[in-house]
């Protein structure tokens, strides 16, 4: 069985190769290993574990050394992939010297590794998202400039409203994507933080240095907090203000940010679908031979990119609500809500990046029919400017009376005066 995201046929439509690599078993495991290597380095610097142990732990924290078949079997048995990875590291280091590998994973817990790996995966994902936002903004700026004086009819409740320019329509979208860029930059320092705090979030196993060849405090800070800082530095992450094992608001914020972002893409795609209708004919998706073709109606040019965008964005919004549900976790380690994230977060990221790539493609190659816009603007034979007539007459006969004159069908005559 395959899903639409990892399908050989649909995979590059509903995901991207870059995202598939980030959320793969191999990359997740690599980040587990990066955590263990970074932890060993930090603890050796502080005298918590022997330098020899740290050197060999780091040496064997290579994804190429992991037996993924054994990892799969052990994960099915244990329920989590972290302990099987740690067991493999310990076993390899113990071949160097008996018991030397037992220093691996010192003071850490399963969720420390899992959460930190997710943060690193999100960091990679949002780097790609940021690139897509920048490309979309650049394309929109070009459309705004090119069509700033191209008149068209605005639509209110799907009816012609008043004249606007197509450049103005694009400028509103540009403002939205610029706000999304700001949101992303504001999100990063809250999201890109380490999780390393031990079983219940207190760093209790290394809170006191009495059993280590290390001082109780380093640089005026408790040993556990200093270890946390060094590990964060190794991984290029921020230091958490406090443990967040069952405080999942930052991850939910990331998911809901992607929901907002892709919803803006879907707003544009919805407008484009309507503008591509045969009876409207104001804009079209980029032309590529056979793209959007019908199997039975050769004249059709379907808005296939817009359809993909709307479908993916709707799915992201639905799954983002599941990430909000995962916030409701019990005590200091949840029984169930945590696993929700494992299910939906990779899909949210895959669909979001694919959605943005489709959006970028549409903006960069958008076909605008200026004559079609002008033609539609003239359909009402001047009625589209009735608001301006009403406001002009309002100075003399009153705005409400002028409105009622137009409402009951006399604006056509007034426009001819």
Regions found by a protein language model. Give the residues of each.
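N-terminal alpha-helical segment
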Residues: 36, 289, 385-389
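Generic, well-ordered alpha-helical scaffold segments in large soluble proteins
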Residues: 38-42, 88, 92, 139, ...
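Glycine-rich cofactor/substrate-binding loops
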Residues: 2-31, 74-79, 297-417
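A helix-coil-helix interface module used to build multimeric assemblies
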Residues: 2-204, 210-230, 239, 291-294, ...
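Short amphipathic alpha-helical segments with heptad-repeat character
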Residues: 123-134, 141, 167, 171-174, ...
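A structural signal for small-residue-enriched, beta-sheet-centric alpha/beta enzyme cores
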Residues: 110, 211, 219, 228, ...
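Acidic-glycine-rich active-site phosphate/pyrophosphate-binding loop
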Residues: 9-11, 150, 228-244, 283-286, ...
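Glycine-rich anion/phosphate-binding loop at the beta-strand->alpha-helix junction
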Residues: 180, 184, 244-338, 342
């Amino acid at each position: 069985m395959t899903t639409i995201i990892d399908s050989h046929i649909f995979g590059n439509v509903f995901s991207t190769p870059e995202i598939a690599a980030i959320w793969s078993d191999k990359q997740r495991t690599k980040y587990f290993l990066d955590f263990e290597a970074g932890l060993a380095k930090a603890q050796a610097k502080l005298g918590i574990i022997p330098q020899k142990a740290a050197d060999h732990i780091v040496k064997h924290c290579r994804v190429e050394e992991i037996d993924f078949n054994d990892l799969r079997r052990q994960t099915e048995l244990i329920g989590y992939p972290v302990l099987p990875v740690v067991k493999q590291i310990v076993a390899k280091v113990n071949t160097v010297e008996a018991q030397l590998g037992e220093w691996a994973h010192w003071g850490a817990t399963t969720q420390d590794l899992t959460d930190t790996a997710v943060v690193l995966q999100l960091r990679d994902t949002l780097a790609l998202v940021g690139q897509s936002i920048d490309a979309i903004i650049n394309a929109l700026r070009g459309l705004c400039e090119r069509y700033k004086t191209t008149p068209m009819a605005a639509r209110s409740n799907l009816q012609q409203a008043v004249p606007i320019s197509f450049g103005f329509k694009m400028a509103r979208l540009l403002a939205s994507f610029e706000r999304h860029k700001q949101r992303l930059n504001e999100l990063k320092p809250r999201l890109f933080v380490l999780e390393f705090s031990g079983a219940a979030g207190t760093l209790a196993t290394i809170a006191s240095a009495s059993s280590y060849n290390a001082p109780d405090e380093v640089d005026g800070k408790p040993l556990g907090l200093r270890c946390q800082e060094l590990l964060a530095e190794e991984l290029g992450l921020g230091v958490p203000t406090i443990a967040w094992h069952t405080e999942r608001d930052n991850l939910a914020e990331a998911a809901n940010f992607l929901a907002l972002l892709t919803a803006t893409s879907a707003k544009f795609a919805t407008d484009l679908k309507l503008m591509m209708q045969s009876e409207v004919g104001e804009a079209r998706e980029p032309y590529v031979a056979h793209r959007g073709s019908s199997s039975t109606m050769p004249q059709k040019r379907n808005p296939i990119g817009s359809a993909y965008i709307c479908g993916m964005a709707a799915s992201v919004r639905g799954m983002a609500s599941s990430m909000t549900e995962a916030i409701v976790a019990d005590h200091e380690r949840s029984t169930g809500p945590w696993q929700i994230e494992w299910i939906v977060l990779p899909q949210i990221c895959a669909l979001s990046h694919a959605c943005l790539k489709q959006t970028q493609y549409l903006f960069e190659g958008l076909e605008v029919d200026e004559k079609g816009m002008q033609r539609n603007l003239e359909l009402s034979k001047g009625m589209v400017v009735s608001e301006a007539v009403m406001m002009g007459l309002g100075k003399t006969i009153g705005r409400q009376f002028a409105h009622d004159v137009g409402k009951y069908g006399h604006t056509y005559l007034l426009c001819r005066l």
